[in-house]
């Protein structure tokens, strides 16, 4: 599955007041220091991995207070509901650093989580991802589209993000299964805005078209990293140009779709390579891009090559906006569907409908 560590979406049962924002999340959302500059200035550790180093020490701007299920009723309730419905979440499977914040919610935001469809086992083994892998995962649950749509409709959410594992063992990569889920959600709640973080479907245009015309509102597929690093970071079946083609074709068959992608920083990419990647994305008519820091999920995964400073994330946000992206979210702990982005995209989509 592509970029499972970059997702978010799905509000919990109890509504709370919403705050609509025009820009991405502030860096103050991610650090506890009085100022970003102070946190960076006081850090005495290395920012780049050097020869002979085992790993980099975690800098202060990446440290977050974890919210345990016992500490927040929203976390506990959502976990029980998802388990009862046999629904997987990428928040748990991919060890997302924002799980406690999003599942727990706050006074000015909804508790959120991301539903991961087609099981919790992927046919691909990307070197940055902690989701389980197998050549032949269990068969699809035929009741999953119905269960998922029923659950989401009962939660009363306005904006939902769905993601999935890769299923190269299926002829269509699972496109029919995912399409059915989206269509049932729209049937049960027509006003629901749906974002899907999708696989590349092994480059199959028919599967891409099935999803682009399914009724979803945001077609997301993550490029993950620059072209040079793609063979090293992603599963060999996940190709850089193949990802660009999927995003481009989705826009071609459904021009009103918002297309979206995400880039991890800190894997050894050069600035010129990031700029080329952004140029490739704009040439493919991608509307939204997010940047986040790669963080090693376990010792078996790729080492972090560089801690990218918050200031640098701000610079990439400004650079991307000048290229014409509709929306940019950039920060150390930003993931591809960070909730501030969801609220922003919700307003964009509503305005387009009116």
UniProtKB/Swiss-Prot annotation:
One of its GO terms (biological process) is lipoate biosynthetic process. [4Fe-4S] cluster 2 binds at residues 122, 126, 129. [4Fe-4S] cluster 1 binds at residues 91, 96, 102, 337. Binds 2 [4Fe-4S] clusters per subunit. One cluster is coordinated with 3 cysteines and an exchangeable S-adenosyl-L-methionine. SUPFAM superfamilies: Radical SAM enzymes. It is found in: Mitochondrion. GO terms for molecular function: 4 iron, 4 sulfur cluster binding; lipoate synthase activity; metal ion binding. It catalyses: [[Fe-S] cluster scaffold protein carrying a second [4Fe-4S](2+) cluster] + N(6)-octanoyl-L-lysyl-[protein] + 2 oxidized [2Fe-2S]-[ferredoxin] + 2 S-adenosyl-L-methionine + 4 H(+) = [[Fe-S] cluster scaffold protein] + N(6)-[(R)-dihydrolipoyl]-L-lysyl-[protein] + 4 Fe(3+) + 2 hydrogen sulfide + 2 5'-deoxyadenosine + 2 L-methionine + 2 reduced [2Fe-2S]-[ferredoxin]. Disulfide bonds: none annotated. Residues 107-326 form the Radical SAM core domain. Its EC number is 2.8.1.8. Its cofactor is [4Fe-4S] cluster. Pfam families: LIAS_N, Radical_SAM. GO terms for cellular component: mitochondrion. Keywords: 4Fe-4S, Iron, Iron-sulfur, Metal-binding, Mitochondrion, S-adenosyl-L-methionine, Transferase. InterPro entries: Aldolase_TIM, Elp3/MiaA/NifB-like_rSAM, LIAS_N, Lipoyl_synth, rSAM. PANTHER family: LIPOYL SYNTHASE, LIPOYL SYNTHASE, MITOCHONDRIAL. NCBIfam families: lipA, PRK05481.1, PRK12928.1. This protein may be expected to contain an N-terminal transit peptide but none has been predicted. Belongs to the radical SAM superfamily. Lipoyl synthase family. This is Lipoyl synthase, mitochondrial. It comes from Caenorhabditis elegans.
């Amino acid at each position: 599955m592509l970029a499972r560590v970059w997702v978010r979406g799905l509000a919990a049962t109890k509504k709370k007041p919403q705050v609509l924002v025009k820009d991405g999340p502030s860096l103050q959302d991610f650090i506890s220091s009085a100022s970003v500059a102070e946190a960076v200035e006081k850090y005495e550790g290395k920012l780049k991995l050097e020869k002979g180093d085992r790993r980099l020490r975690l800098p202060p701007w990446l440290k977050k207070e974890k919210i345990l299920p016992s500490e927040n009723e929203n976390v506990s309730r959502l976990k029980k509901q998802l388990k009862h419905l046999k629904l997987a979440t990428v928040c748990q499977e991919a060890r997302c650093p924002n799980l406690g914040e999003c599942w727990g919610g706050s006074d000015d935001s909804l508790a959120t989580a991301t539903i991961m469809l087609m099981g919790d086992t992927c046919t691909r083994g990307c070197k940055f991802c902690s989701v389980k892998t197998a050549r032949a995962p269990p068969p699809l649950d035929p009741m999953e589209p119905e269960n998922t749509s029923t659950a989401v409709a009962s939660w009363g959410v306005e904006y939902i993000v769905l993601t999935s594992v890769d299923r190269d063992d299926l002829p269509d990569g699972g496109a029919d299964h995912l399409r059915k889920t989206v269509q049932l959600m729209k049937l049960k709640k027509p006003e629901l805005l749906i974002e899907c973080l999708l696989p590349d479907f092994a480059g199959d245009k028919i599967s891409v078209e099935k999803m682009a015309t399914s009724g979803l509102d945001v077609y997301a597929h993550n490029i993950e990293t620059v072209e040079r690093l793609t063979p090293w970071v992603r599963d060999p079946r996940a190709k850089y140009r193949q990802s660009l083609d999927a995003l481009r074709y989705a826009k071609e068959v459904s021009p009103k779709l918002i297309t979206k992608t995400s880039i991890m920083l800190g894997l050894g990419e050069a600035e010129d390579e990031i700029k080329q990647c952004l140029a490739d994305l704009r040439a493919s008519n991608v509307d939204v891009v997010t940047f986040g820091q790669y963080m090693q999920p376990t010792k078996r995964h790729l080492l972090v090559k560089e801690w990218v400073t918050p200031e640098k994330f701000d610079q990439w946000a400004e650079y991307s906006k000048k290229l014409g992206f509709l929306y940019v979210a950039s920060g150390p702990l930003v993931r591809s569907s960070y909730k501030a982005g969801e609220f922003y995209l919700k307003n964009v989509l509503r305005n387009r409908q009116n």
